[in-house]
């Protein structure tokens, strides 16, 4: 197999993506589908799922609130019924969490962020590992954030979960290596899209500056002076599912244009 051939994802992969009906998750799903994978997405939003089914006929799309352990378990029953197994789990579902000082964040906001961004990733991994052990190309991919390598003032719950995801990934890579399961994390930087627009808007309102000025402040944090796209993240995700990445595990890979600070 040539080096170029090794860059192509393994054919026919069975891929499950949490939070896969919109945003980065949808772009990841589209990329895997284009590469010939069998894709199952779950998402909390029924309108997003309906739009996904219309856009990608023949795919499996399941409604699930990832804060509910029983609903996550149900996703894996669907996975087994439709695909008979799993090769790649993309642990993608997450929320932005509150924006504000630590003294202004409520316990409920903190717990909600931890539950969706961290506990759900553990629960998905818990159910996925038996299936991944039966796969010849088992890969567990956690979507974290550049906030998982930098401090992030005013976004403490979010940053705390992303650091924890990296720790989860590192531990699972050591634990599952002998089963030939690779475990990695992608750390997207400041990603263009509605979610980031909301973060910028909230921060601008909080400090009392125009939204355009706050947007430029965010761009100034990036060495390349541009935000990344969901397609940038998807391209790296596909690489990690290729023979070229067969010895890549335990890595927290930044796709961020070199964010210098947050």
Where do the protein language model's features map onto the residues?
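Short C-terminal tail/terminal secondary-structure segment
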Residues: 2-7, 96-99, 150, 226, ...
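Canonical Rossmann dinucleotide-binding motif of NAD(H)/NADP(H)-dependent dehydrogenases/reductases
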Residues: 7-40
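Short, small/polar-rich loop/turn modules that mediate ligand/substrate recognition or access, typified
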Residues: 85, 177, 182, 248-250
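Substrate-binding pocket helix/loop in short-chain dehydrogenase/reductase
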Residues: 100-102, 106-114, 218
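Active-site helix of classical SDR
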Residues: 125, 161, 169
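Alpha-helical segment proximal to the catalytic Tyr-Lys
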Residues: 130, 174-178, 246
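Residue(s) in the substrate-gating loop at a strand-loop-helix junction
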Residues: 145
């Amino acid at each position: 197999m040539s080096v170029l051939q090794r860059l192509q994802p393994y054919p026919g992969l069975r891929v499950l993506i949490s939070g896969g009906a919109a945003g980065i998750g949808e772009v990841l799903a589209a990329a895997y589908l284009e590469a010939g994978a069998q894709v199952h997405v779950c998402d909390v939003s029924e309108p997003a799922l309906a739009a996904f089914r219309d856009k990608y006929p023949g795919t499996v799309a399941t409604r699930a609130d990832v804060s509910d352990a029983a609903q996550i378990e149900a996703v894996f029953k669907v996975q087994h019924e439709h695909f008979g197994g799993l090769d790649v789990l993309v642990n993608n579902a997450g929320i932005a969490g509150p924006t504000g000082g630590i003294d202004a964040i409520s316990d409920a906001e903190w717990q909600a962020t931890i539950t969706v961004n961290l506990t759900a990733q553990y629960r998905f991994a818990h159910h996925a590992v038996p299936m991944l052990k039966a796969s010849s190309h088992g890969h567990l991919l956690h979507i974290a954030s550049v906030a998982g390598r930098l401090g992030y003032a005013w976004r403490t719950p979010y940053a705390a979960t992303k650091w924890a995801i990296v720790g989860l990934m590192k531990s699972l890579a050591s634990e599952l290596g002998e089963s030939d399961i690779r475990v990695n994390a992608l750390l997207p930087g400041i990603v263009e899209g509605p979610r980031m627009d909301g973060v910028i808007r909230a921060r601008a309102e909080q400090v009392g500056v125009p939204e355009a000025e706050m947007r430029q402040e965010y761009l100034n944090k990036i060495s390349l002076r541009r935000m990344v796209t969901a397609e940038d993240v998807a391209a790296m995700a596909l690489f990690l599912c290729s023979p070229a990445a067969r010895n890549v595990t335990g890595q927290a890979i930044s796709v961020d244009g070199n964010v210098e600070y947050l």
